[in-house]
Amino acid sequence: MEAFGGFFVDEKAARVENIFLEFLRRFKEADAAEAFYETELEAMRSRESTTMYVDFAHVMRFNDVLQKAISEEYLRFEPYLRNACKRFVMEQRTGENRAPIISDDSPNKDINIAFYNIPMLKRLRELGTAEIGKLTAVMGVVTRTSEVRPELLQGTFKCLDCGNVVKNVEQQFKYTEPIICVNATCQNRSKWALLRQESKFTDWQRVRMQETSKEIPAGSLPRSLDVILRHEIVEKARAGDTVIFTGTVAAVPDVMALTSPGERAECRREAPQRKNGSGVQEGVKGLKSLGVRDLSYRLAFVANSVQVADGRREVDIRDRDIDGDDSERQKFTEEEEDEVVRMRNVPDFFNKIVDSICPTVFGHQEIKRAILLMLLGGVHKITHEGINLRGDINVCIVGDPSCAKSQFLKYTAGIVPRSVYTSGKSSSAAGLTATVAKEPETGEFCIEAGALMLADNGICCIDEFDKMDIKDQVAIHEAMEQQTISITKAGIQATLNARTSILAAANPTGGRYDKSKPLKYNVALPPAILSRFDLVYIMIDEPDENTDYHIAHHIVRVHQKREEALAPAFSTAELKRYIAFAKSLKPQLSSEAKKVLVESYVTLRRGDSTPGTRVAYRMTVRQLEALIRLSEAIARSHLERVVLPAHVRMAVKLLKTSIISVESSEVDLSDFQDADDGTNVPADNDAGQPTEMDAAPQQDGPENEQAADTGKKKLVITEEHFQRVTQALVMRLRQHEESVTKDGDGLAGMKQGDLIIWYVEQQNAQGAYSSTAEVKEEVKCIKAIIERLIQRDGHLIVIDEGAAPAADDGAARRTSESRILAVNPNYVID
């Protein structure tokens, strides 16, 4: 350095400035006609920006000495690099008709510089004092952001003794005054007044960055670091983003050490005359002396650029932009669009995309299809009153242990750019929604984001959902339907966005799912939570030799060959691009699809009101909205801009397989049907007890097997059908019994034939049968159900056998239609 006009000139920094200016003038990409950063100036003009983004890879290709100087001593050369950018901008504006970036009205306007694409990413734990002043890049998760406040960059001070003005006093990470007045006759060192109108301020924001989960060593807690954002990069990082910050490490005074109780390490010169009469040293007077004598410093990261880790922001699937900026909208290149169209034209592409979801898990196609539709989502809408209509799809997976529920959640959290994985057992209401914390420096209360806020515009995966406390489950009611979080705490009243899809996993209450009971008895979840899920899937671990063989073969093959064992049709990168492109579409409902939607909803409501129907929860308008969202997601998966009736039918099928047939286990009635179609029963036996022939073991042989095959056909009905018929018959018998008791005369029971005729007439009045064959088949099923209710379940009892008139041979035969039935007094309807 040499003295020049009373000031020292940094010759090395001046040379770096000139070389960097030459780089901006001359650097060209291969086969490019004009300089690369001349086109960058055009982009700066279009977005009215004062920040020039420089690719550090270009600097490395241009001059190795320049890149080494910038990397090693960035903090020293940073003002000179900004000055080079300003000179480059001033050169390019001459002789042009375009609006200049720096106008004549504001010649002191600064041009900021932002580097990106640094080759080596540092881990947060590697940032120490050795990195102070160097240009580095670090990746982490943003956990907290402060409000944007003004920061003093260069101050203009007025001497209170002589009135002299000192300009351009650079601030050194704290309030910095001139050391001494420049007036030779004035020796003022402490009496200064800041002239705010002539000082230079900029936007300032502090962001808390935390290590990513992959970088945390075993047995260690995640570390955090404060990141300082300035100028135009404020509000670029949001809580929950995984971000790459480029900048330098700086040592800043620790304000918390000043305010905390106890002794502080302080550097001072021994001066007896500065002690007062009691021998006690003077205290720190305000923040002016902060950092002057205190030895309490901490590391902070001063960033010059912010880059989302996955290279691009997620698609905004709402009508408005994420931050109200058109530049944030997803843009696809022609190559990416061609690749998406190629995937769409692959034969049977939908099933291949479903198979590409979580390929490490064998089978479970319905759940994979639900996860794909959840990743795509429906179309978000806003009413004229400003009410948001949810477009995100919520999915709940209930299943036995070791059914790969957590693997589905982990995979989904990894494929989405903005996602949060948490466990319900260890999550509180504040941890899921938001909490109010105290700002360490200002002492004011601020809102710290919870899991649902961090997953805004993404997916929140909650494992062990049933293990959450009731008060914690209530906290997410609003977030699941209105997609907002309302907070009224510590003087803060705010409504925060939680526009996220929820993928939850829960275990049955008894450890295993009991198919004989409805879903509400198997899962410890209230109906208010269950109704907010669009799809609820049950995973039951049943022994099946064929399925078990294929699962074992798949798992062993994955352990043996790792990635080679998995050969999905589309890779994860292709799947991400396809989903991102499909989410940018906003399909509209066609008139034909509207008709199918209305008819399907009416049919579902009619089935819900049928006695004995066993569904996961009641059919409400929420399920109609779920059908709309699923139809739009299916249309997106096919890259259609219009929702077709076929999409609606597929959505109805998904809804039926998830919540209506959730307990659709089969009931085998083959042992309870009569060989002669159930018209006669042997006279020597009590109808309420099994016959001796039934009790005696049958001899094995081809004759007996043939007789069994010809005498009885296999009769299997669904559990829902069985329960519906059972409850209808029991209710009719109870009504008859009450009427007889009230009148005081008549028989308490009903004839079986009259009971069957009543049920068939009731169903026929509702249009349940279309032919005589269906009626005969239904009568056969009802007879078998009655036999089971008498012989096995004991829900019905036989009061009288009801002997029929003598036949031609003079023998009296008992018929099942003529016997009198009643409800067992100990039976209680569920």
Curated annotation (Swiss-Prot):
A motif (Arginine finger) lies at residues 531-534. One of its GO terms (biological process) is double-strand break repair via break-induced replication. It is found in: Nucleus. InterPro entries: MCM, MCM6, Mcm6_C, MCM_CS, MCM_dom, MCM_lid, MCM_N, MCM_OB. Residues 671-710 are annotated as: Disordered. It catalyses: ATP + H2O = ADP + phosphate + H(+). Belongs to the MCM family. This is DNA replication licensing factor MCM6. It comes from Oryza sativa subsp. indica (Rice).
